[in-house]
Amino acid sequence: MFIKILPLSTSSYISAGEVICNPASVVKELMENSIDSSATCIHIEIKKGGLQSIVVKDNGCGIDKSDLKASLLHHATSKIYSVCDLNNITTLGFRGEALASISAVSRIILSSCNISSKKVGWSIYSDGFGVISVPKLVVHNKGTICTVLDLFFNRPVRQKTIKSEYSEFLRIDEIVRSLSLSNNKLSVSLRHNDKLIRYYDNCNIDFCNINMLNAIYGLSSVIKVVPVDYFLNTMKITGWLYLLGSYHTSKKKFQYFYINGRIILNRSVHHAVYQAVSEINHYQYSVSYILYLKLNCNELDVNIHPAKKIIKIINIRLIHVFICQAILYSLKKECILKKDCTKIIKNISNNKKKNNLNYNFQSNLDITSCIVQENSYSIPQKLFNLDNVSIIETELKFKRFKCKDYLNTIFGNVLMVIKNFYLLIEKNDELFLFFLPRAKSLICELKLKFGVKNGLLIKKLRKKYFYFFKNNTEYHFFLRFYEILSHVGLNFNITLKYAELNSIPFMIDDTNLGIIISEILYFFKIKREMSLSRLVTTIMNHSKILVKYWDHLQVLSVISECEKYYKSILELNVISYILQPINFDSTVNFFKNDSKV
């Protein structure tokens, strides 16, 4: 797809683009461009709340050399070409105004490498006054890097409206969070003043479970997570409802609703969710949610508002009923019964006498919640009133529910942390110990082997590090193994006399750089070869991944990473390296052989 300037007959039908009024709007536009380019990894670096610099890197399809200049012009886009395309918009952006608006209020450096090029890209520079430089050849990985410098340097009035760095960063943080949640295949990192603030990893598992949200949002009062998965004809809605306690503060509530991957603000859509939940909970619980609705593109009109959050849904009444029905179905499938449990016990006892059911019921059973599941669904006049329950199915099983929700993982149910370094895990009525430090070390090692292209985080050096070549052998070593070094995040600018190190993997401390490079060169002098496994071993020997105290967030991070790389762990046959069964045979034999027992 090539970037073309839209003709007047088409651009006149497009609504005005969003005005760049703060750094958050810059980040929003650049992230949407990255997502539209099919990027799976986006790195965002902010300095001084975005006023000094904003850098957005992605691994998308890139921009061709011939399209670089055109991308900074108004109404230049590759997403639509005619008026007919406005009725079938599948991308987040379509106006071709983002980069042009940003370049008008800042200095911008745009460099990119498309799929056809092999680590050879092109870069252009705009000075903020409409002057665009000639494309220059640069070494570049596949994707695009957009650097925005000195935002509003030529608009002093807008600079005065900026409150503070912290308030602007909070806006950016919310924008990054909302766009990251739009796609679970997207990996996003956010840095502010050279510090890693957020990292949203791409997950194929349920990345919005209750434990993750406890860590991210501090939602300690989540009572129940209700998954939503419902479809009708061409409409489909998925996501999660989070029922919160009535004392839950409104500041920690979150409501994200996405239509075709775009976060939207629509009163009818949000009202449908609240209407369905209120009929079940009778306003006794607050609700937060993350919901994804898929519709045909021709049923939406995105071209009505500059921010593109406010859209027009053609059959809004049908969508309202569909959303309400989907929420009611999900809540009925996993319904939280808030009534007095004695009513349930009384009804069951009565049904036992009527139907002559031959089973023993425990009278002092502690039921804190009950799940009613049905295969079919129809909307009754009075929804799920426990007083009207007259017949309980014989197949219904009651279990003693525990107040604490354990983290359910691929390895089993995580019960507790033992002696600060071990997780006690239960699976299939067996207990296992999960060694946290080894697991973290193993994940770091796998990330190094998979490399930067597969999500390895790198960090820029605060101070420049130069290695001066002692002889031509060292110079040729860096040239020969440049790709394998950059694969693990060791990026060098190589000259005839020295190599300048620009970035390193996240697990390396700056103080160990000299030792690591010396060991790499020493091994090369002896073996005359450098393999990826040897390089990874050298880096891991000098990495700092020791955790003194494993808190809830760190445990969740390691577990989710291990689930992500679970297939690789099985293929390498290193599962026993981090997970071992607990043997109770000696203890049981002791009690059996003890004469006192």
UniProtKB/Swiss-Prot annotation:
One of its GO terms (cellular component) is mismatch repair complex. Pfam families: DNA_mis_repair, HATPase_c_3, MutL_C. GO terms for biological process: mismatch repair. Gene3D superfamilies: 3.30.230.10, Histidine kinase-like ATPase, C-terminal domain, MutL, C-terminal domain, dimerisation subdomain, MutL, C-terminal domain, regulatory subdomain. PANTHER family: DNA MISMATCH REPAIR PROTEIN MLH, PMS, MUTL, DNA MISMATCH REPAIR PROTEIN MLH1. The keyword DNA damage applies. One of its GO terms (molecular function) is ATP binding. It comes from Buchnera aphidicola subsp. Baizongia pistaciae (strain Bp). PROSITE patterns: DNA_MISMATCH_REPAIR_1. This protein is involved in the repair of mismatches in DNA. It is required for dam-dependent methyl-directed DNA mismatch repair. May act as a 'molecular matchmaker', a protein that promotes the formation of a stable complex between two or more DNA-binding proteins in an ATP-dependent manner without itself being part of a final effector complex. Keywords: DNA damage, DNA repair. This is DNA mismatch repair protein MutL. Belongs to the DNA mismatch repair MutL/HexB family. InterPro entries: DNA_mismatch_repair_CS, DNA_mismatch_S5_2-like, HATPase_C_sf, MutL/Mlh/PMS, MutL/Mlh/Pms-like, MutL_C, MutL_C_dimsub, MutL_C_regsub.
